[in-house]
Regions:
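Glycine-rich tight-turn/loop motif centered on a GG-T
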Residues: 62-72, 106-113, 146-150
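A glycine-rich helix N-cap at a beta->alpha junction
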Residues: 62-88, 158-164, 168
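Phosphate/diphosphate-binding glycine-rich loops and adjacent basic-rich segments that engage nucleotide
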Residues: 83-132
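Well-ordered secondary-structure scaffolds
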Residues: 8-9, 17, 112-115, 119, ...
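Active-site cofactor/substrate anionic-group-binding motifs, chiefly glycine-
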Residues: 1-49, 53
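Short glycine/serine/threonine-rich phosphate/pyrophosphate-binding segments
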Residues: 26-34, 39-40, 47-48, 55-57, ...
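Acidic, glycine-rich active-site loops and adjacent beta-strand->loop/helix elements
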Residues: 22-24, 51-55, 66, 141-143, ...
Length: 372
């Protein structure tokens, strides 16, 4: 499958080249932070990303919410940026693994869309079409993922890691919890703003920061830069010094994006807003994360088909999440959209997706394990 279309030859890029891929989630803006952070630590990140579909978001859409950012570049320009800056994120061209689209059409009519081996080959054929030296896979598990159970996620991770290693790529999978939205935002501009603030300050939502450091340290360790703990310490240092934010600014500039939006995130248009209020008092015991993803889709933040247009301002601020206490009438979420007529359906979906109870339930750890 990897040989069915264009191969992406990265041999002109000097140094260890590593890619990071997520199987999809809600609020998953890790690539926006991990890619420049890993580059600031010394590895080359040549990342080819996809668009969002259904309730999950895509890195390409998020980057395109930065005015001017070009996600389609000639490969030689892509290589030049990686050599000069250390990181570049582009979109996948139509002729990379074209047979995958044909195979997916067959899966769609043969009830094999959920087949783990076929999911694994679809993902890994695209990764193997590029000449990276290492691959870090973020395999999400839970209500906001396509992998609803730990067993399914672990099996998928094992298949993909085995494929990568057999092809001569250093490959590791990080199993992550998606039983609540990742971070405090869902949607394109909203997630970019949250990622920028983390890059600027080294501070943010604790689960998002923990996962960013886990993924980055896995990338550095694959590159032979030390064990996980020493690599994590290096990543923390590069966040605190602002070097990772500078890498992000340099990358956006080379992609012709407007860097002034990164320096002053108030320039992002975030639509009109509506607060969603807690219907009763208690602890947030559970969130149907897919429901939150669909609620953001209803606001215009995603697409049902690849031809749909996206409202970059649309999305949800997650004000309260699992394990937090609310009083009746407290704000639990803030909806964003350019079209206020979309609020009613989205608000209803958010309220349907949240359970409030009397007992404090601790959320799952965000990192569930590793497969190597």
């Amino acid at each position: 499958m990897a040989k069915s279309g264009d191969k992406i030859d990265l041999s002109n890029i000097k140094g260890f080249k590593v890619d990071k891929h997520s199987t999809g989630g809600v609020g998953d803006k890790t690539s926006l932070v991990v890619a420049p952070l890993a580059a600031a630590c010394g590895v080359k990140v040549a990342k080819i990303s996809g668009r969002g579909l259904g309730h999950t978001g895509g890195t390409v859409d998020k980057l395109e919410s930065i005015p001017g950012y070009k996600t389609q570049l000639p490969i030689d320009t892509f290589e030049d940026i990686v050599n000069d800056v250390g990181v570049s994120i582009i979109g996948q061209s139509a002729n990379v693994v074209p047979v995958d689209k044909k195979l997916y059409a067959i899966r769609d009519v043969t009830a094999t869309v959920d087949s783990l081996p076929l999911i694994a080959t679809s993902i890994m054929s695209k990764k193997l079409a590029a000449a990276d030296d290492g691959i870090v896979l973020e395999v999400t598990i839970g209500s906001g993922s396509f992998n609803k159970t730990f067993d399914a996620g672990e099996k998928l991770a094992r298949i993909m890691v085995d494929i990568g290693n057999a092809a001569g790529k250093k490959t590791v999978a990080v199993l992550t919890d998606m039983n609540q939205p990742l971070g405090r935002t869902i949607g394109n501009s909203l997630e970019v703003v949250e990622a920028i603030e983390l890059l600027k300050t080294g501070k943010g939502d604790s689960r998002l920061l923990e996962l960013v450091l886990a993924l980055t340290s896995a990338m550095l360790s694959l590159a032979g830069m030390g064990d996980i703990n020493s690599c994590k310490e290096l990543a923390i240092k590069k966040l605190k010094t602002g070097e990772a934010f500078k890498k992000f600014c340099d990358m956006v500039s080379r992609h012709e994006g407007d860097v002034s939006f990164l320096r002053d995130t108030s320039k992002f248009y975030l639509g009109v807003t509506k607060e969603v209020l807690a219907p009763k008092e208690g602890y947030i015991a559970k969130i149907d994360t897919e429901g939150y993803g669909l609620a953001s889709l209803y606001l215009g933040a995603g697409r049902n088909t690849m031809e749909d247009k996206i409202d970059f301002s649309a999305g949800i601020e997650v004000v309260k999440t699992v394990g937090e206490y609310v009083h009746k009438g407290d704000v639990i979420a803030i909806l964003h959209s350019t079209n206020k007529d979309l609020f009613a359906q989205s608000e209803q979906k958010v309220l349907e997706s949240i359970q409030i109870g009397d007992i404090l339930i601790e959320p799952n750890p965000v990192v569930l394990g590793y497969v190597q």
